[in-house]
């Protein structure tokens, strides 16, 4: 086993930024907040996973422009949509090379076979690779792509055709998402033949701007620039290092000390010092996000509407905004942010009313002192800068109405895994939009198809689901908006969640970092970025 030196050793050796004698402009250290659960992006749902995989190592047929929401050509140079809106023919880019590593040497360039493998593995539970390495693809399923993609066909080496069962107004946007990252069919075949298919999640091969070099869980991930990248002007960093630390205060100190050049999700308490540091800049933008409490409606007493209403109106949201977000948050009312088109501004929040909450609990037959669990995420997220404090404040609010909440936390990957399995009673959860479409909120987080994935409330309402699915099949945006607004009213009335806040996103970095663009989807992309002290 090769020894992985701690970050300080690399710094001392002058191999990373900080030494005037190193070729610093070609190296960059990112103070990351957590370890990825794995390196196969199709298996995961969080930004922590995607930063280390889909954004860095992989490409998709189409991708979102850096810092924006527009889907642009990537591994597909162009595409044609059939008159019925159900067929999409993609014309693939030629000359694209897969990563060459010590564990895989490609013998051919990217072609249609790779697209087929990528999607057939997710569509067909009897696919040979999936049978050898059984896994689930929760986000792919949450979006309903497993049901709506009827087939994927290879027309020739550089053309593939997707046929849908129903019109999907968000299909191109969905193909730009992380779960649609293109894998190497040749590499998968090699792993299958060797009896090691699980290595697709440990030793990744993509076509992206960086290549995985080394990984030490909870310590660092090292990438090297892909010199064979199909868009060479985007690879301006020779060595990209993710220095992992779950403590935001430590990340801030490392940034100020020059041990890393960029970080994410600073604590509100650290913002002023970061903004005043002479060597730093702290760009910001309104967050396309939502932090909320999810109630598991499959657990008693959360199956009763009166109980959910009571817990909702017992939470002092303004106090949370003041203490947790410290002025960098906006009170949330709906299940998506107000910057999302189709947001219904007519919907009002329930008033903060502990006395009425007690009455509702009594009506529901919930005894004084009833015990429940309240899960709190162990890491900072763009939508929740301090989950521990938020959970403690909610715990205190619920205690005032006779509910005893026991706070539970797990390592981030385990937290998500157990949430998908529905082990919680109530939990702090949140979302940053992934594609700019309302479906990414209203279906992915609250739809019936998502109850085994990101719908951690496990709430399935037939009337709501009918509206959301109908909206996806309509191309006219005004008509879609009307359907989505009706769905938002049902969501608010049924209270599977308590929306808490939309946060402002801050991205502290050294002034030496240039051309980094804050993503509306909270991705951290380092292609096209330079570091010039």
Curated annotation (Swiss-Prot):
Family listed: Belongs to the bacterial solute-binding protein 5 family.
Gene3D superfamilies xref list: Dipeptide-binding Protein, Domain 1 (3.90.76.10), Dipeptide-binding Protein, Domain 3 (3.10.105.10), Periplasmic binding protein-like II (3.40.190.10)
Any one Gene Ontology cellular component term annotated for this protein: outer membrane-bounded periplasmic space
Organism: Pseudomonas aeruginosa (strain UCBPP-PA14)
The protein's name: Di/tripeptide-binding protein 3
Function text: Part of the ABC transporter DppABCDF involved in the uptake of various di/tripeptides. Prefers dipeptides with acidic residues at the C-terminal end. Involved in the uptake of phaseolotoxin, a toxic tripeptide inhibiting the enzyme ornithine carbamoyltransferase.
Family annotation (Pfam families): SBP_bac_5
A GO BP annotation: protein transport
InterPro entries, per database record: Peptide/Ni-bd (IPR030678), SBP_5 (IPR039424), SBP_5_CS (IPR023765), SBP_5_dom (IPR000914)
Membrane-crossing segments per the record: none
Alphabetized UniProt keyword annotations: Peptide transport, Protein transport, Signal, Transport
Lineage of source species: Bacteria, Pseudomonadati, Pseudomonadota, Gammaproteobacteria, Pseudomonadales
Quaternary structure (record): The complex is composed of two ATP-binding proteins (DppD and DppF), two transmembrane proteins (DppB and DppC) and a solute-binding protein (DppA3). Five orthologous SBPs (DppA1-A5) are present in P.aeruginosa, which increases the substrate specificity of the DppBCDF transporter.
GO molecular function terms attached to this record: peptide transmembrane transporter activity
Signal peptide: 1-24
Keyword Signal set for record: yes
